[in-house]
Amino acid sequence: MKKWLYIIPLILIIIIWQASQIYLGSMSYQKKEENKAIAFAKENVKELSSITDAKYYHGRLAYTILYGTNEKDEELIIWVPNSKKGRLIVKKASEGWSKEKVKKYIIANQNPLKLIDIRLGAEVIKDNRTNKTETTPLWEITYIDQEKRYTYYFMKFTDGSFVKRYSLKKDRFEEEN
C-alpha cells in the first residue's frame, strides 16, 4: 500500500511535466513564427517604423497578422504569410473596417446569441466573373447563431462585403446546463 503513495504522485508529476513540455513547445513554435514574420516585415515593408502586436490566423494558408505604425504614425496592418504560397499584404488600418465596426455590423445583421471572436485573416478567393484568384484580407467572425450553431462568418477587410459563412451542427457544441 505504501508503494501507491509514492507511485501515484510520481505519475502525476510526470503527466504535469509532459503536458507543460508540450505546451511550451507549441508556444515556442508560435513565437518563432512570429519572430520570422516580424523580421520579414521589417525587411520588406519600408514604411514600417514600429510593430505593436502580432496575431496568428490559420485558414487555407497560415498568416501572422502584424499591427504597427509607419513614419507618419499611421496604423498599419501587415499580413505575413507563413509559407511561400501566400503573399505579403500591407494596408493602412484606415483602408478597412475596424474591429468595432465589424462587431456592430454583426450584432445588427446576424443577431448572434453569443459573439465569440473577431480576428483578421486572409483567404484565397476566386472571382467567378473573371475566374481569377486573389488573396484577400478579411475579418473572421465566430459566434453562436440563433439556432445555437457555431458559425464562422467572413467579410472583406476593405469594404465589409460578405465572403462566406458556414455553421457547425448545433448538437456538437450545445452547452450542458
List where the protein language model places each region.
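Long, terminal "pre-/pro-" and other extracytoplasmic accessory regions
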Residues: 1-177
